[in-house]
């Protein structure tokens, strides 16, 4: 062999191989699914390239996958006549993992094998799964359109290095030979291999054939028997497809080992003709928050594969959706650029978006437990929707789930429809609070009056919530109201103050004036409030003022944050406020007011600029 060289695996490959062999062994037969799936992808890519260059078929347009084994040599071979690989492509695809974030992903894996197998499964192990059952793997490949002498040989024992060399290979495509480990003889059994192919590959449009050897007139005659149906699953009638087939097809296109939560298969005819098969995964992909990674549907045009990860058909907040679209209205030579500006694309995107939202609404109604699984995995992504998709805002809002004072649990299970159905007579607004954590939201002094009145408050503690609520202004005709902002409806909820209380409040006017003079420009205003029952003071913001949580979002993003001007509200019935009002010594009065303000700021922001000063001030007042 010419041009032979030995190279070391990228470190992530070594780590993945080790984890995979140990974590996936209990489900080892999936290696055959993965290798056949890769062969199917190679055929799809050849079909696509041949649209503009039919010579790539080299006179052989009947694409297929073939599986054969040699019991004497203990080898299993999977071959295809797809697009094949050049030497550079072999090194890129078989020696490295070209995915950003791989290293941190692998470092996150621990010793929990069940969990590891799920995570590795969604990572998409593909070719490397061969090493689960093989102690050596040999690859012979030639790219379509290359000369026979430009074939490539690759071999590795899956430990630390691999060998690559130039060979002559007459037929294009890729041939992968697995040298099976001791104890893996089941994969040399014709019936066993056939059953695995039927189980995992019935839905693939490409014929999968197994070698048949027969003795005729003293000679061995080799023929090939087709094992799978070889009809693209989405082209079949829905009534003929079993749930098991839908699940296996999902695993094929998503490279996921887990079953999907739900799916929707639709054929649309009329002004636009297309078929869609959309899946909601049961687990978030490891790279869902990686902005560099493309997320999208597989695109077919008239059953011809065009591209993976076509992002144009699904809004970003639905980037977790997996599946495909097969359109009859797009040209076969369509490119990502053409898709970007196409009216057909926009119409398909709108239709598919509505389809997914309807699918999620149905899941929420039919199976609350499954929907809760969805929400735990993808709720944060769906919360991007109200800002991104105004046209579907009401439909998205119905799908949102929140923690609430009604359930007294951190689990986000309350829908806006649930909340509205429980609103008190005369209640006009949907009340909510945003905070850094569920505990901080639940114990906020802003809730005291509402708890006393039995009015439900949504407790929002995800980082995205404050941003989302800037766009989500109402639901079912009811406006949202943050309880940390000054609002007339909140003041109305306070009990009517009797005449004697009003007189007592008038008597506190000089006290309020003293506080204003002391704090000056540090606060926007100082006033008395009847919204508190147990707390001496709170800070709140005007409706047009930036909220505390929004200021934190800006700061976390490294942006300049304008100073939040708070309104300092004091509870006239609280013993500490009364004590401060009765204090004539200006130095001690200042200590009391500063302590009450710091307490209110600490409850609102979770931090103080000078916590040591706060502690000293509190200690001085405790001993005085």
Curated annotation (Swiss-Prot):
SMART domains: HATPase_c (SM00387). Residues 553-624 are annotated as: C. One of its GO terms (cellular component) is cytoplasm. Keywords: ATP-binding, Chaperone, Cytoplasm, Nucleotide-binding, Stress response. GO terms for molecular function: ATP binding; ATP hydrolysis activity; ATP-dependent protein folding chaperone; unfolded protein binding. It is found in: Cytoplasm. The keyword Cytoplasm applies. Residues 1-336 are annotated as: A. Belongs to the heat shock protein 90 family. Molecular chaperone. Has ATPase activity. HAMAP family: HSP90. This is Chaperone protein HtpG. It comes from Shigella flexneri.
């Amino acid at each position: 062999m010419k041009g032979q060289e030995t190279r070391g695996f990228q470190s992530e490959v070594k780590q993945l191989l080790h984890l995979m062999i140990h974590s996936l062994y209990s489900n080892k037969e999936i290696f055959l699914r993965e290798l056949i799936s890769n062969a199917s992808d190679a055929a799809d890519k050849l079909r696509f390239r041949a649209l503009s260059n039919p010579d790539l078929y080299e006179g052989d347009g009947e694409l297929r996958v073939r599986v054969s084994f040699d019991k004497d040599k203990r080898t299993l071979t999977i071959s295809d006549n797809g697009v094949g690989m050049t030497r550079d492509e072999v090194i890129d695809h078989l020696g490295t993992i070209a995915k950003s974030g791989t290293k941190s992903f692998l470092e996150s894996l621990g010793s929990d094998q069940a969990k590891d197998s799920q995570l590795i499964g969604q990572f998409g192990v593909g070719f490397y799964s061969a090493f689960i059952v093989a102690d050596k793997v040999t690859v012979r490949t030639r790219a379509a359109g290359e000369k026979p002498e430009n074939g490539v040989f690759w071999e590795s024992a899956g430990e630390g290095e691999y060998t690559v060399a130039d060979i002559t290979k007459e037929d294009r495509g890729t041939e992968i030979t697995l040298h099976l480990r001791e104890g893996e003889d089941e994969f040399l059994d014709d019936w066993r291999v056939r059953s695995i192919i039927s189980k995992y590959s019935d839905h693939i449009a490409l014929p999968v054939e197994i070698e048949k050897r027969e003795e005729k007139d003293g000679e061995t005659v080799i023929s090939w028997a087709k094992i799978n149906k070889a009809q693209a699953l989405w082209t079949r009638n829905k009534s003929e497809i079993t749930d098991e087939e839908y699940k296996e097809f999902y695993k094929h296109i998503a490279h996921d080992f887990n079953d999907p939560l739900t799916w929707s298969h639709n054929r649309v005819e009329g002004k636009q003709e297309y078929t869609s098969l959309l899946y909601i995964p049961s687990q978030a992909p490891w790279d869902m928050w990686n902005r560099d990674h493309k997320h999208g549907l597989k695109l077919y045009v008239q059953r011809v594969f065009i591209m993976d990860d076509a992002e144009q058909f699904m809004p970003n907040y639905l980037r977790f959706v997996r599946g495909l679209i097969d359109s009859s209205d797009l040209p076969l030579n369509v490119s990502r650029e053409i898709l970007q500006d196409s009216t057909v694309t926009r119409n398909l995107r709108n239709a598919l978006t509505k389809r997914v939202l309807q699918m999620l609404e149905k899941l929420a109604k039919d199976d609350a437990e499954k929907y809760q699984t969805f929400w735990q995995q993808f709720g944060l992504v769906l919360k991007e929707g109200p800002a991104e998709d105004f046209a579907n805002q009401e439909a998205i809002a119905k799908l949102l789930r929140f923690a609430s004072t009604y359930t007294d649990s951190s689990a986000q299970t309350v829908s806006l429809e649930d909340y509205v159905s429980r609103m008190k007579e005369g209640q006009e607004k949907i009340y909510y609070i945003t905070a850094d954590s569920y505990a901080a939201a639940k114990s906020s002094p802003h809730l005291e009056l509402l708890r006393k009145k039995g009015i439900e408050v949504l407790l929002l503690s995800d980082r995205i919530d404050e941003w989302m609520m800037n766009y989500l202004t109402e639901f079912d005709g009811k406006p949202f109201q943050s309880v940390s902002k000054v609002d007339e409806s909140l003041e109305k909820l306070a009990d009517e103050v009797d005449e004697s209380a009003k007189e007592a409040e008038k008597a506190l006017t000089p006290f309020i004036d003293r506080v204003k003079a002391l704090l000056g420009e540090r606060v926007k205003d100082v006033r008395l409030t009847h919204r508190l029952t147990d707390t001496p003071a709170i800070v709140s913001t005007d409706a047009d003022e930036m909220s505390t949580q929004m200021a934190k979002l800006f700061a976390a993003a490294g942006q300049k944050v304008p100073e939040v001007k708070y309104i300092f509200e004091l509870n006239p019935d609280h013993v500490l406020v009364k004590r401060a009002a009765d204090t004539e010594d200006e130095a001690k009065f200042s200590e009391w007011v500063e302590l009450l303000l710091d307490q209110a700021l600490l409850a609102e922001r979770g931090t103080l600029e000078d916590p040591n000063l706060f502690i000293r001030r509190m200690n001085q007042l405790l001993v005085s």
